[in-house]
């Protein structure tokens, strides 16, 4: 491989928007879909709706419980909603991050730029969450035990008809309160580990995989409390009996007005431990998901820049 391809890879943050859009979209789909079953486990463990999985000792036991009771495909309910939302959201997310990082650092790398990496991640998150929040609402309602919706489209239509557009953004401020620190920690950690493992900042699959996994796991663990609050706001449903069919189903109930209501309810029902529900499942989901996301992003960024270099 000639030096030209490497030079183009290093210069990407300053000008190659189409590359970042394409690589980011592919990375988003991989990140959210590959480990999706554990995201379903996390949602059920964090929600205050009735769910047998809250009594399981580990996320793996919870996943097997869902499969045993509801079938192999049940943990994948809602994956199409998150895939549809994550591709445009991540395309803009990575593009904005790279452009902001290049602007704030002058396209230089190093520990001295840690705050610039964090600030770039925050700006990217504001745009990402505005696109992703409606998909997150649909996804989490589809993931719930006893969810009455047959498809993600049906879920979106029912939420809109019963609760209005506001329902899709009820948890937006909470999502930002979680994702702003998450992404700041995530990007600062990723760039830190890249500087340690890959000081020349060349394309290096192993360093991207390791740095991505470590960064995602740390950020996920530290922001789990706000993730619990977000899940409670997104899954405001109550269990009701259906005597005719001898089953339980979930009916939408708008009970929590915002972050403070959700925090008080979680604490009153579960105590302080309620804010760490789903931590293991969240980390299990996030470590490989973030590792794969960065690996795919860096791979396609490199491939697309290399192709561009040869075609010019």
From Swiss-Prot:
The chain crosses the membrane at residues 17-36, 78-97, 113-133, 171-190, 205-224, 278-297. It is a multi-pass membrane protein. It comes from the Eukaryota. Disruption phenotype: RNAi-mediated knockdown results in smaller, but normally-proportioned animals that are paler and thinner as compared to wild-type, a reduced growth rate, slow movements with a 35% decrease in the number of body bends per 20 seconds, reduced brood size, increased lifespan and inceased sensitivity to the oxidative stress inducer paraquat. RNAi-mediated knockdown results in increased lifespan. GO terms for molecular function: ferrous iron transmembrane transporter activity. Mitochondrial iron transporter that mediates iron uptake. Probably required for heme synthesis of hemoproteins and Fe-S cluster assembly. This is Mitoferrin. It comes from Caenorhabditis elegans.
